[in-house]
Amino acid sequence: MQDGSFFAPATVEGSLSLDRVTFLLLSPSLSLWTSDDVEYRRNQQKLEKMAGYIQTVLKDELDPDFPQGYPSQLFRYHYRTLDDVDIQFGSQLPKRKKITDADIIEAFGTVEEKAEGCMYQYNPNYYAFRVEYNPNKASLRSVSNLLESFSCNQNASLIRIARLDVAIDFNAPIMPQMVLCEGMRKGNIHYGPKGIQTIYFGANKSRNQFRLYDKRQEMIDKDGVDIGHDKWRLELQSRESFCLDSVPDHGKVFQRFTFYDGAVATGDWKLDMIRRDAMNYGLDVALRSMPPNTATRYRKLFKERNFKQNVETPSLVYYREFPGAMERLRCDILSACGFEML
């Protein structure tokens, strides 16, 4: 049973930003995966020329402390600018497509594939040039000369977003225990000196994964900077690939995530724990195991304190602020690639 005094309209508003983006440019000649030895050697030569070209065009922009040109896990060459724009090209793995059509498997599958009921088709990855950056901390100006020359013969509709991190910040001490994420299992939970510091929903390799974490504490740990007020961030990491002119509705994913009423912490951990139990079982049950004097004291606190500071629904923040943020990102990418913006 829930006490109605805990419920009220949201007073902690969220603020949305795009925290990280990865986009791909069509580049068939920069893919190393091919069954043709002649084509492989030809593409390898093109990769070497591209590496030399990047070192020339970006010579004043590259981070001297980064091992420039070394391979990454998926690409032959990896470069990083001073403002943390990552450029990778030369895909070393193919694009894999799962086939479940029974007729195709029966006609072309191996004995093992027929038994498993699926087979895989492998093709060259023609999106072999990748750019990754954080729009909050960097722009694409430092690499615009490279992108303009690289994509001069491309159609803007062929630029693909491979990953997009959508962040919603709440300037309040959120209680991670007071959240619900439908259809996504809780993953790793990281604890800090004050309790839960980060909680994940969804698998690491899934198309969508949520992370709720103490942004203030993260900034202290990473940068030694204290912003002076509480800030919790709900971050959606989406690996749903899409073209710039066909953006998926991430709001449907955010609709899975809900803050219970009273999700803002009071600063009194015992009071917050009692409040959480009272939300589920009622105040009398939450106080039942306490000594009479302690129970009376906390019952009085419940009457005196205002628990009506609730958190705005994340999907509402998304639908209010994402369209503008996405349009700004779209303009930034297209402008950096040399397309005229009307």
Regions found by a protein language model. Give the residues of each.
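Helix-turn-helix DNA-binding segment
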Residues: 295-300
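Structured, helix-rich domain cores that form ligand/interaction pockets
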Residues: 1-290, 308-342
